């Protein structure tokens, strides 16, 4: 008996789902609103279409270059700061780059405890 109740329920649920799907589907297009065919354009329409495409492309490139300039400007602005923190970081960077020159010119080559084990030399005149 349960078998006879199942097919009408199945048919009814399929119809409900079909109707619900129709409400969300794209609107019906008429036969005359076919796909766009560029071969049917006359010369003036093709020129207008080409001009619109070129204009759109130029606007897109202008937006991209404007966005790139904004990001580049913020990067330059960050590098050109003159606050005490920035100057301290610049000085630290300069000292770390010139550290090898300072070591070779000002510090003795022998370092460690053996440097003081030999006879004392008087550096004062």
Curated annotation (Swiss-Prot):
Keywords: Cleavage on pair of basic residues, Disulfide bond, Receptor, Secreted, Signal. Coiled coil: none annotated. PROSITE patterns: CALCITONIN. One of its GO terms (molecular function) is hormone activity. Residues 1-25 form the signal peptide. It is found in: Secreted. Gene3D superfamilies: 6.10.250.2190. GO terms for biological process: adenylate cyclase-activating G protein-coupled receptor signaling pathway; regulation of cytosolic calcium ion concentration. Residues 26-77 form a propeptide. Its main location: secreted. Disulfide bonds join 81-86. InterPro entries: Calcitonin-like (IPR021117), Calcitonin/adrenomedullin (IPR021116), Calcitonin_CS (IPR018360), Calcitonin_gene-rel_peptide (IPR015476), Calcitonin_peptide-like (IPR001693). GO terms for cellular component: extracellular space. Belongs to the calcitonin family. Stimulates cAMP production in porcine kidney cell line LLC-PK1 via the calcitonin receptor (CT) but not via the CT-like (CL) receptor. This is Calcitonin receptor-stimulating peptide 1. It comes from Capra hircus. The gene is CRSP1.
